[in-house]
Amino acid sequence: MKLIHVFSIFGTAESFFDGQFEYLVNLGYEIVVVSSDSPLVDAFCRRNGVRFVPLCIPRSVSPSAITKAVKALCSLIRTEKADAVFGHTPVGALCAMFAARMCGVKNRVYYRHGVIYTTMRGLKRTIFKTEEKFVASLATSVVNVSHSLSRLAIIDGLNGVEKQYVIGHGTCGGIDAQNIFNPDLIDKVKLLTLKEKNGLTHADVVFGFCGRICNDKGIPELVDAFEFFKGKYPDISAKLLLIGGFDIRDGVSEAKKRQMRNDPDVLVTGNVDKDVIPYYYSLLDVFVFPSHREGFGMCVIEASAMEKPVLDSRAHGCVDAIVEHETGEYVELSARGICKGMEMMLDSSLRQRLGRNGRRRVLNCYDFKVMWPLVGDLYRKILK
């Protein structure tokens, strides 16, 4: 069976499907990956045994760009005689599902990695919510990456319950908790070098975040919470380590950037290579994720796999990623609510217990070895 997976950017394929595609190829599927080109494509294709076709798939709503992409996809689908087309991310999925429907493809699968309208207002919210409904109506199956996202889809009428699925406990296919996100693999000398590079000491209590530095991720609230915390506990040497770069489309205000720059205890790494992400998690005492919306909070389970306790929001896609009082604690999406969670995490025995439980949960629920067979089961169920 020949499957075409359509992505707006190649990074989505590399981040979430590297290894999983190889697993599916070994099950007998032929996979063609479609996205904008990338220098990482050749190595990815060799590792996974897939083919790649470069096409310009728009990331934003542009009628002319979407029309051009749909025409190109229709031509490709007919040439390849695809048995199934998978669409990822809102606009990429719109192009993929529309083209597949026009070509009469029997299996049209929309991977809903998240929804963006929930943090919008007015006409913009209506437009993007309508787009979600339209894409889902074109699909024969919708794979939501979390159970909370599935509940939201039903509440907001995005699609019927009969066509939507979640893989296991959620995510696109889990993480590698054995060979990548594994605290036992951390080189102590390398970790010490990284700690010194970031100006951290053994005396510091390090709160951390990983991801895009933007409003939707709750960065303004997190920075203010850290300021409250330091004011309340001046004798504690606390640091806030933000692992990631500043986002352009949803960037924090200039005033907030100045606040961050003027606080020597707020450390911003900028974009870092994915190979060193486990080392950055290892620098943390507590992982904080005050996001306003997610498909699934992947960095939460990455941090949990590294035995880090988590302060998490209850937003859709976030709420699934921890078990309250067992692997982490929920916090209110406000500066004072996050600060209250930080205070709770001053208990080192609590941090250790939550961290140990977190890794155990990831191994049981989200490791590749657990998730990939479930992906195979889903494909057998939904593909005709």
At which residue positions do the language-model features occur?
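A conserved mid-protein helix/loop that constitutes part of the nucleotide-sugar donor-binding site
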Residues: 14-19, 205, 209-228, 369
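A short, active-site helix/loop in glycosyltransferases that binds the activated sugar's phosphate group
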Residues: 39-40, 139-181
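Short, structured helix-loop element that forms part of the nucleotide-activated donor/catalytic region
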Residues: 42-45, 228, 233, 239-268
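A short, well-ordered alpha-helix in the C-terminal region of glycosyltransferases
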Residues: 196, 350-365, 374-377
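Aromatic "clamp/platform" in nucleotide-sugar-dependent glycosyltransferases that forms part
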Residues: 292
